[in-house]
UniProtKB/Swiss-Prot annotation:
Pfam families: DUF1967 (PF09269), GTP1_OBG (PF01018), MMR_HSR1 (PF01926). One of its GO terms (cellular component) is cytoplasm. This is GTPase Obg. Residues 163-336 form the OBG-type G domain. It comes from Fervidobacterium nodosum (strain ATCC 35602 / DSM 5306 / Rt17-B1).
Amino acid sequence: MERIEFIDVVDIYVKAGDGGNGAVTFRREKYIPFGGPDGGDGGDGGYVFLVADTTLSTLYHLTEKKKYFAENAQNGRSRKQNGKNGADLVLRVPVGTIVKDYDTGEIIADLDEPGKYCCVARGGKGGRGNTHFKSSTNQAPKFAEQGAKGEEKHIQLELKLLADVGLIGYPNVGKSSIISKISNARPKIANYPFTTLVPNLGVVSINGTPETSFVVADIPGLIKGASEGKGLGNVFLKHVERCSVIVHVIDVSGSEGRDPIQDYFDIRKELEFFSKDLAKKRELIVGNKSDLLTPEEINAVKDRFLKEIGEGILLISAVTGQGINELKYAMWDIIKESKKMYVGTIDITKIEFEKPSPVRLVLPDRVDIKILKNDKGEFIVESEYIKSYLEKYKMEAKFMLEDVLDILQKNGLDEKLKKAGAKDGDTVWVEGVDFIFKE
């Protein structure tokens, strides 16, 4: 039978930092009131990285907000001072997380090893200050480059959950109710095409931090004969193999007409039939529905488990909440011990992230020119290239008219104006600035 995977899915938006703008400044010193350009460059925007961290078991910590931003860079300053780069944003995810582009479904990365990382959004390149644009024909450039915008992306994170705790027991013993009491979140679970039976998972947090969160799974389908393939027992038993703790949930009230001790032995038998290693896992015996027992009956149940099984039983009530906190901490104590045995733990604060090239402002490949005519008989020049050019150098056309006209004329502006019917003395507009056409 097909093996079932528990898939946790989280969708988030990430935005890298914008590059800082280059500065337009000039030296202002004693005896040099009108010195040359000294504008510094803008810094580069921060990047967004995802890194696989062995201390995490779930994606729950990334559900607290939907949007994540790296820091924008600072602008350049006078005296050729460059702006500070924006801080990178590093998001930690569990080992085994698959990163996808939400819109296309394309896999960006499979973070299947501790410390493995990927860049999901590049920061913008900082703009150059006016110092870079001094030339023999322009000793005092009054323009500089604009910083590029950082990348933004909608990504989907998928994690094949490895449940830390498996709740096993007969149907109707209250496993789902226990999960609803102890857990803070319900992961978004993938659909199973061959069954309407959906595994019930919960994320438990001890003190609200990702490092103290763990996954609890209700393993359904466990009935007598499960190890022989009855129901879906053997499929879900495969998942229990990966748990750190097995919690036997038993109905101590006897409301289903079964004996609690016999229930325990039946489930243990199924585990041993399926896998000897599985039967050796750390276990907790939990007696649910204890609120239906009298104090005398509670003492009798405890004594009987100690005498006949040799282990104590933790009595709880998923209805009243009695013993729930004690159960959470008992599970966490065992999980902590198992996590100490993990190998390959990496200090992600010491990782030196390799960065791809930042996003740069790029001008269109060609100079496009479109001529329109308004109601006054004036000609309007439209050009995406010129718009991009002015954005790149954060200047209004009136301050760069000579440069703009030079670019346009080299690409056939005069011929296009004549073809559109322009004559000597007509008014022509380019990005809000007018000039007189001369043949």
